[in-house]
């Protein structure tokens, strides 16, 4: 099962929405690949450094999600993720 970063707001999760917006991770690291990839250092239950595949943002059915987080990103890391998503989607801030 591929690890993912949930980027959807808590309100939709709490409302029982049937899908969740995610960014998949890969351990196939690629240097200098921003903005399409962002590096996440190994921590908690995420055993290896991984790249977030920003260009593969998508919604998945909640039944595909496993309970419990492998790791949590800091506020600064999440802001970098959201900035990069906005850049890739050409959304003005």
Describe these PLM feature segments:
Residues 1-42:
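Compact nucleic-acid interaction/catalytic patches
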Residues 42-93:
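C-terminal terminal-subdomain/extension
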């Amino acid at each position: 099962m591929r690890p993912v970063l949930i980027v959807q707001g808590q309100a939709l999760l709490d409302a029982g929405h049937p899908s969740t917006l995610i960014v998949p991770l890969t351990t196939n690291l690629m240097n200098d690949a921003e903005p399409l990839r962002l590096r996440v250092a190994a921590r908690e239950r995420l055993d290896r450094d991984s790249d977030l595949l920003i260009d593969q943002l998508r919604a998945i059915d909640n039944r595909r999600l496993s309970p419990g987080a492998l790791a949590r990103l800091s506020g600064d890391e999440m802001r970098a993720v959201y900035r990069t998503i906005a850049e890739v989607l050409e959304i003005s801030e």
